[in-house]
Each structure stands twice: as C-alpha cells, then as structure tokens.
Amino acid sequence: MADICSILEYCKMQQSLTVPSLEQTEELKRVFRSLYETHTVFCFHGELGAGKTSIIKVLCQDLGVQGGMSSPSFSIVNEYDSLNKGLIYHFDLYRLREPSELIEIGWEDYLNSDSILFVEWPDKGGGFIPEDALHIFIDADHSSDLRTLTIKN
C-alpha cells in the first residue's frame, strides 16, 4: 500500500478504487490507512446520495470512532474522538453561502490541529481548501451498491 502513497505524492497521479458495497470495504480501509501517514485533509466529491457520508462513517469506524456518526449538514462540522488518531473533524460545506464562512467557524484552527479532516462538498470552500488535500471523487452506480473512488492529489 505504500506504493499508492508514493504514486499520489511524487507522481501526482491518481488511484482508482472500486468498493463493491459498504459491507465490503477492507480494500478501502487499507488504502486510507496508508494515506493517513502523509495526509490529514481528505475532500470528498460526489452528487447527492453518492455515499460521501457513508464512506466517511466506514473510515471513522476503522479509526476507532465509537457511537453515532452523522452528516454535519446543519452544524457544518462534527467532532469525533477516535481510539487510533485522536480527534477527527467531519465537515459538510454544502450549506455554506460564502467560503469566508469557514473563517467564522475557526477553519485555520482545524487545519493547524494535525487532526484528520474529512470534508464533504469541498468546492464550497473555495480557496480555503489546502493545496495538499487529497480529493476523493465518488461515482455511484445507483442500480447497485457499487462505488468507484478516484483519489487525486
């Protein structure tokens, strides 16, 4: 799996990953475990219902988050305490009217915390998304539970 990090980090290429269902996520977890070593900001792109929140839940559970997790659609950010990585912040920027609203919620403090940040709808964040963030594009096949994730640096 270190090869994936090398490809993303040094070659600026992309990696595609197929998730057959939300019950079959071992490969997804394995890929992200290696990515946590070099990245803290993960931006999830996809249409409504593509599975952004569901995939983030799987990743949080793998990191040792216990208890309920939900999309922070109305609160913009949820904080989870993980057994393996400390605090994890889950952002849903869908309802932002202006990217500058991120300043009001302390975006810089979150970025400087060295915590893992999972961000849904990062396009709403404008220039506030760091250049070294990983971008995960989710393409969902709505006739099945299949999702194709494309990870780009």
Task: Describe the residue ranges of each PLM region.
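Phosphate-binding P-loop
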Residues: R33-H39
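N-terminal pre-Walker A segment at the start of P-loop NTPase domains
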Residues: I7-V31
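P-loop (Walker A) phosphate-binding loop of NTP-binding proteins
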Residues: E47
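Conserved lysine of the Walker
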Residues: K52
